[in-house]
Amino acid sequence: AQTVEVKMGADGGLLVFEPAKAGPHNVVFDEDNIPPGV
C-alpha cells in the first residue's frame, strides 16, 4: 500500500487542496499496467 499524506492547506499556508509532491496517481486499477514493486 502507498502512504498518502493528507494536509489541511498548502505548505505556503493557503487553504487549498494541494496533493503531496509525488508521481501521478491512477485511480482506475489497470491490471495490464501494474507498476514495478507491487
UniProtKB/Swiss-Prot annotation:
Domain Plastocyanin-like intervals: 1-38
Sample GO molecular function, one term: metal ion binding
GO cellular component, one term: chloroplast thylakoid membrane
Cofactor(s) required, per the database record: Cu(2+)
Residue numbers binding Cu cation: 25
UniProt topology in membrane: Peripheral membrane protein
Keywords of this entry: Chloroplast, Copper, Electron transport, Membrane, Metal-binding, Plastid, Thylakoid, Transport
Major subcellular location class: plastid
Function statement: Participates in electron transfer between P700 and the cytochrome b6-f complex in photosystem I.
Record-stated family: Belongs to the plastocyanin family.
Name by which UniProt lists this protein: Plastocyanin
Species of provenance: Thalassiosira oceanica
